[in-house]
């Protein structure tokens, strides 16, 4: 068991999640800004 390998894999998973969630977060933020006027 290599903790660094595990960390690397976890980091990639987090990065993938951020990359896929990024556009959604931006859209929600934009919608909220528009709603606030």
Curated annotation (Swiss-Prot):
One of its GO terms (cellular component) is extracellular region. Pfam families: Cecropin. PROSITE patterns: CECROPIN. One of its GO terms (biological process) is innate immune response. Keywords: Amidation, Antibiotic, Antimicrobial, Immunity, Innate immunity, Secreted. It comes from the Eukaryota. Coiled coil: none annotated. The modification Glycine amide is found at residue 37. It is found in: Secreted. This is Bactericidin B-3. The lineage of its organism: Eukaryota, Metazoa, Ecdysozoa, Arthropoda, Hexapoda.
């Amino acid at each position: 068991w290599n903790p660094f390998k595990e960390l690397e894999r976890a980091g990639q998973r987090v990065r993938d999640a951020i990359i896929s969630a990024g556009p959604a977060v931006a859209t929600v933020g934009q919608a909220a800004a528009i709603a606030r006027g």
